[in-house]
Every structure is written in C-alpha cells, then in structure tokens.
From Swiss-Prot:
Enzyme class: oxidoreductase
Gene (name only): CYP7A1
This protein's name: Cytochrome P450 7A1
GO BP annotations listed: bile acid and bile salt transport; bile acid biosynthetic process; cellular response to cholesterol; cellular response to glucose stimulus; cholesterol catabolic process; cholesterol homeostasis; negative regulation of collagen biosynthetic process; negative regulation of fatty acid biosynthetic process
Catalytic activity from the UniProt record: cholesterol + reduced [NADPH--hemoprotein reductase] + O2 = 7alpha-hydroxycholesterol + oxidized [NADPH--hemoprotein reductase] + H2O + H(+); 4beta-hydroxycholesterol + reduced [NADPH--hemoprotein reductase] + O2 = 4beta,7alpha-dihydroxycholesterol + oxidized [NADPH--hemoprotein reductase] + H2O + H(+); lathosterol + reduced [NADPH--hemoprotein reductase] + O2 = 7alpha,8alpha-epoxy-5alpha-cholestan-3beta-ol + oxidized [NADPH--hemoprotein reductase] + H2O + H(+); lathosterol + reduced [NADPH--hemoprotein reductase] + O2 = 5alpha-cholestan-7-oxo-3beta-ol + oxidized [NADPH--hemoprotein reductase] + H2O + H(+)
Length: 504
C-alpha cells in the first residue's frame, strides 16, 4: 500500500513539474507583463471572476497600463489606458472580432457555428442586424415598441384600475415583466392563434428565459449546459416556441425576424431547431441587457428628486410641443425618432445609469503575430491571443468622472443643457469616454433601439403613473458581479416601489 501511494505521489509530482516546465507560458522580449496564475488552465480566472474591477486595478498598479493574464486557457492582453483605446481599434486588420462571439453563441445556444467561414450558412449576421435595427427599419421598431408598451401599461377600457390604490411591486420584477413582454411582441409579433392565451404564453417564456439566463455566465465560461438540467429544458422550450412553423402564425413580426427566417431557409444548412436557436440568440440579445438597464434608469431617476423633476419637465414639454395629450382612455402617446433623440435630460439619466452599472468586456482575437503600437509603447502579440478592453475601469475613473460612484443625472449635460461630449484624462481629450455598448466593429448594432426602448418606458412611467420608492428602499442595491463581462449588471436584490395611475 505504501509503495502504491509513493508511486502515485511521484507521478503527481512529475506531472506538476512537467506543467511548470512545459505548461507555463514564458514572457518573450517585447511582450506585456504576464500573470499565469497558480491553477493549470484556469490561470487567474477565479480572481478575475470574484471582482474583475479590483483584479484589473491591482494588476494595473503592479504592471502598468498593459498586461497579460491567463484566463480559462486563453491569454488575454488587457489595455487599461483609455487614451490608447483608439490606437487599439486602429489595428483592426490584425483582429478577428467574430471568432470568440460565434464560438460563444454556438456553445451557449446549442446551434452549429453561424460563421460563414465554417460553411453552415452564408448569411453575414452583423449586416442583417445593421440593416434591420438601424436607419429606416428603426422607425417601425420604435413605433411598434411604443404601441406594445402602452398596450401593457395602460388599463383596459373596461377596467376600474384607473382609480385603484397604490400597487407595491419589486421594481426589477416590474421592469422585467413589462420590458420582456413589450420587447417580445415587438421583435416576434403577436400570435394570431392564441389571442386569449398570448399573455400567459409570453409569461411562460419569460420564466424559461430567466432560468436559461441565470446560467448564461457559466455557459460563456465553458461549462456544458447539460450540467444545468432546468436551464437546458428552458432553453429547448424557448427554441421550440421560435420554430419557423410557430413564427409563421404570428402577425407584425419585425423586419429583423422576417429577414432572418428567409435567410435561414435559403442560405443555411441548419435544421428547424437550429434555426429556432439562432432566433433565441436575438431574443437573448434584445432582453438580457436592456432589462437591467431599464431598471437602473428608473431606479436612479426616482431616488434622485432633481433628476425626477428635470425629467418630468422635459417629458411634459416634449409632449406638449408634439401635440400629444396624455390620457388613459384616449389616443396612445406617439413620438417620432427625432423627438426621442431630442431628450437630453433623459439621455443623460440613462447614460449615467449605464456608466454605473455596465461591466462589458470588449474583446478581439489576434489573427496573426503582430506588434500593437500604443500611446505608451509597443507590444508583441501572439496569434490567437485576445486583446481586451474593460470600460468599467474608465467609467469609474475619478480623473475622468469626479466622484465616480455618485449618480449625477446631469453629468452628460453641458452648461447649455445639451448633450456633453467632452471628457478628459491626464489633460487630454478622450475619443472614447462612454462604452457600455462596445466599440468599433464589435459595437452593439441594436444600441439605438435599446436606448429608444428605455426612453419610451421612462416617458410612459412619468406620464401615466405616480411613482414612489417604499420607505427604506432608496439605498442603491449592490451589482450582481457574477455577470461581469456580459454587459449591464443587474441588482443583487430587488427594490420595492409603489405606483398608481395619475388622475388625468
């Protein structure tokens, strides 16, 4: 027994030595400082996952503005000086920004690769998104969202809820319920065969979405979904509801989904379920960050009396100028894109809310060995390494944003009450100072629609409802750090508020 134990001990020690000799990457001349971490494969992943912001700040103090960390078997070069961001983006010819995103999508949603290079489809999905989420297509999306929000938020004609007392509800739950239903109807249309049960069907999809989204960080980290039976079942049910045979029964489907259905049928070799799972990608992308962003915008506005007053006055003035009468029974509110774009106070409130809650990771994969030339030096990068920007470092930098942890509703307003676009670091004007939606080729193609959605929601909340936080609920809830790197962090706990219809 002792001999066997000794042999196993020697074998394990030998493996550890081999790993130390062969498995640890050595920093080469001209490369950034390197942190391999102590755990094989994981590297620094546990420290990064526990608190990305503090982990990166600590390495920034130790190594400077550029350093490399091993995370889940990948070598990630973090660029932390915001003055260098534009220089990084100038090296676009060396980057493959699609590789990581396509691989993550296939892993999380369960379809084959949607990268045209892999031969399963010839659709350029980014072009599809730009074509159907921006320009003229944005008009119909915006109009549909406003209509659906009011269908959900305004009382039915025969209802007595117009005179009801205060309703108390969790604010995050409220935002989740309203924005999910309105967004679902806007993107995927209304079911012609389920008029009576449509709301129940959407709420069932909402529950499945929550179950799936709960494990999404683990899926991105590389864990197989079969480890999470409930989430796997929820994902498959969501996909079933998005099969083409089901979508064809719906009316007022967005141009995005109509075009994607056509391109899936004509340009791909996906089976019916895989096609549905590519639509599930759209559902997740349209909801997962918009919902928490809506919550933070509403919460920060309500808890700040000055913000509430300024926003209410701006909305009232805009509606009057547009000739819109606010009524629970009359015509619904309708604002054009131009009118939505001319709301600097709401825009600043949303930007400030996202600045405080966004934790996105902007990444690109090196297609070949190359030299990265930045403001503070040049660095050799190896093929298949990852270049990463973590904008939360910039968003919470006191030199760029004084008193960075405090919500200031007018932070993005200039002295004339217009949108402020000038921010400085080390006395130099920043080209990139606000990046919750990514940057360059990886910038979110649906960002304009997302901002419109949140503005529309806030306009309707201010127009139709009296709003108050429950006593003792004004303290800002902590951010859920488990989703760091994925976008907008939701609150770790919900906040109770109360609302009732105004006497209009």
């Amino acid at each position: 027994m002792m001999t066997t134990s000794l042999i196993w001990g020697i074998a394990i020690a030998a493996c550890c030595c081999l790993w130390l000799i062969l498995g640890i990457r050595r920093r080469q001349t001209g490369e950034p400082p390197l942190e391999n971490g102590l755990i094989p494969y994981l590297g620094c992943a546990l420290q990064f996952g526990a608190n990305p912001l503090e982990f990166l700040r600590a390495n920034q103090r130790k190594h400077g503005h550029v350093f490399t960390c091993k995370l889940m078997g990948k070598y990630v070069h973090f660029i932390t000086n915001p003055l260098s961001y534009h220089k990084v983006l100038c090296h676009g010819k060396y980057f493959d920004w699609k590789k990581f995103h396509f691989a993550t999508s296939a892993k999380a949603f369960g379809h084959r690769s949607i990268d045209p290079m892999d031969g399963n489809t010839t659709e350029n999905i980014n072009d599809t998104f730009i074509k159907t989420l921006q320009g003229h297509a944005l008009n119909s999306l915006t109009e549909s969202m406003m209509e659906n929000l009011q269908r959900i938020m305004r009382p039915p004609v025969s209802s007595n809820s117009k005179t009801a007392a205060w309703v108390t509800e969790g604010m995050y739950s409220f935002c989740y319920r309203v924005m999910f239903e309105a967004g679902y109807l806007t993107i995927f249309g209304r079911d012609l065969t389920r008029r009576d049960t449509q709301k129940a069907h959407i709420l069932n999809n909402l529950d499945n979405f929550k179950q799936f989204d709960k494990v999404f960080p683990a899926l991105v980290a590389g864990l197989p979904i079969h480890m999470f039976r409930t989430a796997h079942n929820a994902r498959e049910k969501l996909a079933e509801s998005l099969r083409h045979e089901n979508l064809q029964k719906r009316e007022s489907i967005s141009e995005l989904i109509s075009l994607r259905m056509f391109l899936n049928d004509t340009l791909s070799t996906f089976d019916d379920l895989e096609k549905a799972k590519t639509h599930l990608v759209v559902l997740w992308a349209s909801q997962a960050n918009t919902i928490p962003a809506t919550f933070w915008s509403l919460f920060q506005m309500i808890r700040n009396p000055e913000a509430m007053k300024a926003a209410t006055e701006e909305v009232k003035r805009t509606l009057e100028n547009a000739g819109q009468k606010v009524s629970l029974e009359g015509n619904p509110i309708c604002l054009s894109q131009a009118e939505l774009n001319d709301l600097p106070v709401l825009d600043s409130i949303i930007k400030e809310s996202l600045r405080l809650s966004s934790a996105s990771l902007n990444i690109r994969t090196a297609k070949e060995d190359f030299t990265l030339h930045l403001e503070d030096g040049s660095y050799n990068i190896r093929k298949d390494d990852i270049i990463a920007l973590y904008p939360q470092l910039m968003h919470l930098d006191p030199e760029i944003y004084p008193d960075p942890l405090t919500f200031k509703y007018d932070r993005y307003l200039d002295e004339n009450g217009k949108t402020k676009t000038t921010f400085y670091c080390n006395g130099l004007k920043l080209k990139y100072y606000y990046m919750p939606f990514g940057s360059g080729a990886t910038i979110c193609p649906g960002r304009l629609f997302a901002i419109h959605e949140i503005k529309q929601f806030l306009i309707l909340m201010l127009s139709y409802f009296e709003l108050e936080l429950i006593e003792g609920q004004a303290k800002c809830p902590p951010l859920d750090q488990s989703r760091a790197g994925l976008g907008i962090l939701p609150p770790l706990n919900d906040i109770e508020f109360k609302y009732k219809f105004k006497h209009l």
